[in-house]
Each structure stands twice: as C-alpha cells, then as structure tokens.
C-alpha cells in the first residue's frame, strides 16, 4: 500500500467527486485530508462514508464577505472533525469567519534546509560583488504585493536614500504569463530594469536564498509563508506585512521589520537593512534561532499525531 495518486486539475467538481469516491473505495481510505480543492464534496463524503475521518489544513485566511458565503462555508466545513491552521492568524480568521473554534488548532508547517548546488550563483546571474541582494518569492503580483514592492524601490531610488547598490530578485511568476507581462511593465514604467530581476519559476530556491542578504514578503494576505521560513533558515532578516501568520515568525526589531499592507513608504524602510550590514547580520542570527522552531521533522511528527488522534 502507499504511493501517490494524481488527479487532473482541469476537471469539474462532479468529476473530482467521482475521482475521490473511487480512490476511497479502491484504497480503503480511513482519513481524507483536505488541503485545497472543492470543500463542497465534504458533506457528501460524510453521507456516503460515515466512518471515514475528514480533516483539513487551512493554509490561508478566510474573508467572509456576506451571509450567503458564510452559510455556504459552514455547510461545507460541518463534516470536518479537525481544522489544522498553519498559523494563529489563520485560526483567528477561521473562527471569526465561520466558527468551529473547538475543532480548530494551530500546527505550524516546517521546512528543511537543502544542500547548495551552485555556490557561484551570483556570478551566474551577473550580480556584481558588494551589491545587496533582496529576494521575494510568490506566484501572484497582487496577492504577494509585488506592485507595492516596485513602488517602494522606486521611492528609494528617487530619493537617493540607499548607501549601497541593490538588486531585487523576484521568484515564482511564471514566464509568458499575464502576471509576468504585468510585472515587466511595472518594472519598465518605474525605470527599474537594472534593479529588479524577475527570474520566473526556479528549482534552485536554496541557492538563491544563499546569495541573498534580505528577504521581502509584501503580501496583501498570507497564511504562513514557507518562503519566509526558508529565508530564516539561511539567516536572512525579513521585512513583511503585518498580515496572517507573518508576525508570528517575523518579530519586529528582532529578526526584521513589519509594515502595514499597501504602505509603500513603510516598506521603503528597506533602507535600514540595506544601509546597515551589522543590523542585517544581527537580525539574521536571530532569524536562524527562530527557524529552529519550525523544522520539517517536527511538523511531520505532529501531523502523524493528529492522524492517530482522529483514527
């Protein structure tokens, strides 16, 4: 027994429902663990398979805009026995949005530091020696706040507030996508083509973090950023928005700085870290200490414990 069963992404909810039913019957599944996908099938799984356990990991905040949506989510979530929230911020939004406080708990994700494959990546990317490297990772311009980042870098360059030269590496925007075109346009309009590099989707994130000096997470919404956790592992100071679970791993003035989302000028406080190597290194050491609380091994052990508790 064991292995991975893949489902095509481009199928309807009904086809997805049939697929899940088939897997449950064929593999004699005891626990169904939702991460993403159509929660609408959960009530029907409960009816068809009353003995299986249904749990969920909530990776992002819930924003309930109206009563109808709230009722819909309550209906979908009612069959779940457990909600594993990736941060206190996500748990808070979950309870305030749809309730289920007695079923909700925080279980932080974990990361593992990988080996460096290309220690000469700076040379490969043609980044001059002495340039301060800032990195941000995300899949969507608006959600991850890359437009805010571009504006803040533009503000810094226009005001000549930086004592050191910088380069910003943007990772995760698929090349030839609408977002990629929009990002290139934003960068060009701000005349920052020589300061911001969009590297697309990469498999060498660890190599990139290894050559970075500062990590940025200007998200408009965030559950708990695995990218920040990885950055902490590489002793990087972090500047992030005060949303979701970010304040739980970025401690103001200790291993980085927090700013209100949409606030271009607050994010422009990047200059504090760019201009002060000693502050960067001091905060980076604190990041490494904080990262020890979020190991992959601990996350797996706690998840296994939840599986046994629900069985």
Regions flagged by a language model, labelled:
Residues 115-127, 183-184:
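A short helix/loop element that forms part of the nucleotide-sugar donor recognition site in Leloir-type
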């Amino acid at each position: 027994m064991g292995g991975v069963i893949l489902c095509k992404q481009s199928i309807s909810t009904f086809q997805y429902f049939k697929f899940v039913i088939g897997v449950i019957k064929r593999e004699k599944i005891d626990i169904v663990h939702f991460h993403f996908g159509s929660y609408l099938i959960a009530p029907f799984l409960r009816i068809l398979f009353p003995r299986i356990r249904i749990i969920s990991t909530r990776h992002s905040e819930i924003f309930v805009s109206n009563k109808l949506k709230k009722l819909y989510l309550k209906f979908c979530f009612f069959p779940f026995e457990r909600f594993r929230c990736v941060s206190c911020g996500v748990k808070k939004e979950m309870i305030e949005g749809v309730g289920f406080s007695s079923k909700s708990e925080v279980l932080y994700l974990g990361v593992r530091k990988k080996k460096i494959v290309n220690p000469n990546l700076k040379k490969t990317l043609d980044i001059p020696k002495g340039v301060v490297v800032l990195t941000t990772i995300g899949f969507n311009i608006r959600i991850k706040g890359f437009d805010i980042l571009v504006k803040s870098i533009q503000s810094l360059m226009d005001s000549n507030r930086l004592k050191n030269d910088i380069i910003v590496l943007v990772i995760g925007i698929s090349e030839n996508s609408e977002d990629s075109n929009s990002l290139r346009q934003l960068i060009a309009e701000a005349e920052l083509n020589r300061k911001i590099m969009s590297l697309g989707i990469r498999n060498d994130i660890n190599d990139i973090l290894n050559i970075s000096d500062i990590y940025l997470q200007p998200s408009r919404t965030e559950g708990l950023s695995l990218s920040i956790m990885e950055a902490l592992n590489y002793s990087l100071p972090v500047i992030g928005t005060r949303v979701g679970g970010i304040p739980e791993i970025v401690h103001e003035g200790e291993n980085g700085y927090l700013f209100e989302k949409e606030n271009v000028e607050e994010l422009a406080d990047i200059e504090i870290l760019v201009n002060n190597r000693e502050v960067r290194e001091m905060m980076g050491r604190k990041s490494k200490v904080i990262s020890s609380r979020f190991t992959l091994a601990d996350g797996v052990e706690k998840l296994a414990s939840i599986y046994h508790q629900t069985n």
